[in-house]
Structure formats: C-alpha cells, structure tokens
Curated annotation (Swiss-Prot):
Annotated catalysed reactions: L-alanine = D-alanine
Gene3D superfamilies tied to this protein: Alanine racemase, Lyase, Ornithine Decarboxylase, Chain A, domain 1
Organism: Streptococcus pyogenes serotype M2 (strain MGAS10270)
GO MF annotations in UniProt: alanine racemase activity; pyridoxal phosphate binding
Catalytic residues identified in the record: 40, 263
InterPro entries named in the record: Ala_racemase (IPR000821), Ala_racemase/Decarboxylase_C (IPR009006), Ala_racemase_C (IPR011079), Ala_racemase_N (IPR001608), Ala_racemase_pyridoxalP-BS (IPR020622), PLP-binding_barrel (IPR029066)
Pathway annotation: Amino-acid biosynthesis; D-alanine biosynthesis; D-alanine from L-alanine: step 1/1
Name of the encoding gene: alr
Keyword RNA-binding: no
GO BP, one annotated term: peptidoglycan biosynthetic process
Residues the record lists as binding substrate: 136, 310
Residues modified to N6-(pyridoxal phosphate)lysine: 40
Name of the protein in question: Alanine racemase
Amino acid sequence: MISSFHRPTVARVNLQAIKENVASVQKHIPLGVKTYAVVKADAYGHGAVQVSKALLPQVDGYCVSNLDEALQLRQAGIDKEILILGVLLPNELELAVANAITVTIASLDWIALARLEKKECQGLKVHVKVDSGMGRIGLRSSKEVNLLIDSLKELGADVEGIFTHFATADEADDTKFNQQLQFFKKLIAGLEDKPRLVHASNSATSIWHSDTIFNAVRLGIVSYGLNPSGSNLSLPFPLQEALSLESSLVHVKMISAGDTVGYGATYTAKKSEYVGTVPIGYADGWTRNMQGFSVLVDGQFCEIIGRVSMDQLTIRLSKAYPLGTKVTLIGSNQQKNISTTDIANYRNTINYEVLCLLSDRIPRIY
C-alpha cells in the first residue's frame, strides 16, 4: 500500500524515546546479558529499518519474523546478527547463509526434509526452539534436542543458541510461567552440548521476572514504550510511548436534530451540533469498532460518531473549528492523552495489535 504523504494523517515516531526505553530495561537486567531488539512486523509498526539503525550502538542483534524482514535489514546496511524467530524451510537456506542470517529450527522433521532435499548447512548459524508450553513451534525433550543438535553439526551448522517463549509472563498468576521455566531448565540440564546462548526472556519476562534471565533477552513491546500486560500489571519503571498518531479536520459542518451520520445511519443527532471529518479509516488500521471512542481536538475529547469508513471518520465538535485543526488519535494534546493501551482496551484487544494494524498508508515521520 502506498504511503499517503499528501494528506494530514501521520504517525510520528520518537526514536530517542525508543533508545531510552531500551536503556531503561538494560539497567535492570544482569551485566553481560546480550540484548536482541525485536523489530518484526516493521518494528511493531514503528519502522524496522529506522528503529534498527537508531539502536545499533545499544543492542547485540535483532529478531524478525521471517526471511524477508531479515533481508530488508541487511539491504539497509544493518550488519549485526539477525535472528529469524519463525521457521525457515530448507529451500531458503542458501539465501540465509549468503546474508549471514541466523535461523530458528524447531523440529526433527526439518532435518529430515533438509536431508531429503540434499541441503547442507555449512556456514549456517542456528538457534533451536523449545516448546516449553506455548504450544506453537519447538521441540519438547532433551532427547529430541540432542539429536537435532548432532544432526545439525553433521550438516555443518553452528548451533549458537537455544530458546523458548513464555505464554503468560505478562499475567499476575505465574503458575504457568513457572511450569514453563522449570520445563525449560530441566531440558537444558539434559543437553549433552549446550549452545552458547540460552534465552527465554521476552519484554514481560525481562521486566517482571528478571531473576530468570539466562544470557540473552529479546526486547519487543517495551522498546516502544508500552506495557506488555496492557493495564493488568504496573510497570516497574517508566517508559515513553514512542508513537503518536495525528491528523487534521478536513471538513466541518453543522447538522440538525434527526440528521444521521455514516454507513448504516447508526448515529442520529439529538440536537444541532458541529461535525468534523478526519481523513483516516479502517484501511489505515483505525478499525470500524472505534465508533464511540474519542479523539482529541484543542485539548478536548471528541466522540467518533457514525461508523468508521474505509478512509474517513466523523467526530462531534464543540464548535466550528477551522479546517486544518490538529486531531490527535494517539498521544498528547494540551495536557490530555490517549494511549495505545486505551485504544486496545476499547477494542477488547492488546496494544500490540493496535500498533501492528496501522497500515503503510500512514506515513511515519521520525
């Protein structure tokens, strides 16, 4: 989708805030622990290349979801380690090796397929994924991991790391977390040749369970200034939300009692009132269920009335503001604030999703 620079809707990304957030977390983790910045999904909508470049002096490497995301960073000149967290099939190995990209291997079936396709792993750096209870990808026993490591070495791979992912590190009840932690520790203890890097700490684990950190962490949502738990747990130290979203009024009019607004005529005015149109809609990731939520105009909360359209939404105004008046959808406006978590709570979702849904049509300004 093309970025629409010729309309007033923009996302502003504060790279300094991201750097300071990472530094804040690093102050609370043990010395000598490696830091991976998680920049998958275009750095959670913030811009993977720009964020990665900003963090170059602070981090040891980067985590992405797939090979294309890794190649984007390499093509942008990022020369530190890049770990693909998802599964890369053997037919893409040559490209990974050629670009010095570290891959995740999560099953013995992968080895069988690599041998069937006569793939060698010479020069390939690998992290082995353990399923300690997340239930997605990974091996489930020391026996399987030992066999996988031996097989990878036979094929010429450098098995640098082993890792897992916690399902409930951002919840108050740590029962499941502790079960996973003990499972992972027991599996690691049963390895005949333990890889150099062992990591299990995502953002939530790094800030609320720092005593469980091994020798590397993966910092995702906290880097961007958001609470991994949404509103469930308090942050142990302050973070700065790095992304704000703003637009402008492009149309203002008065409607009368009985007039309707938007598709389905779901809003009917009870009295004469001013209505403003803002050029952002569900094609930008501002979803249809945001009807009834508010944005900020002139330091006042203004309700979204009528359904959110593909490209536009309408808000109730307290007066006839001039065209071009700033509208804040995420961020601060005259001492008032709307956070990404506020939006997530209204949508009954998580702050991660709100950010990741902001489409490429919205230009990012740094």
